[in-house]
Amino acid sequence: RPDFCELPAETGLCKAYIRSFHYNLAAQQCLQFIYGGCGGNANRFKTIDECRRTCVG
């Protein structure tokens, strides 16, 4: 899996409410979080399937 899958979920600096998914290293699965719309990091996916393909598979 790519190194960015190990980064923590980051909401970012903006105040939007965008349902997103990230890989949670401790839980070893993709989990939902709310993204603010700007900033953050690469451990952010639009769908849980995209997260799983990238970080779990």
Curated annotation (Swiss-Prot):
Compartmental location: Secreted
Keywords: Disulfide bond, Protease inhibitor, Secreted, Serine protease inhibitor
Claim: Secreted is one of the keywords in the record: yes
One Gene Ontology cellular component: extracellular space
Tissues/organs with expression: Expressed by the venom gland.
Xref: Gene3D superfamilies: Pancreatic trypsin inhibitor Kunitz domain (4.10.410.10)
Site-annotated residues for Reactive bond for trypsin: 15-16
Disulfide-linked positions: 5-55, 14-38, 30-51
GO molecular function: serine-type endopeptidase inhibitor activity
Domain BPTI/Kunitz inhibitor: 5-55
Entry-linked SMART domains: KU
UniProt cross-references to PANTHER family, sorted A to Z: BPTI_KUNITZ INHIBITOR DOMAIN-CONTAINING PROTEIN (PTHR10083:SF374), KUNITZ-TYPE PROTEASE INHIBITOR-RELATED (PTHR10083)
Task performed by this protein: Serine protease inhibitor.
Family: Belongs to the venom Kunitz-type family.
Designated name of the protein: Kunitz-type serine protease inhibitor 2
Organism: Hemachatus haemachatus (Rinkhals)
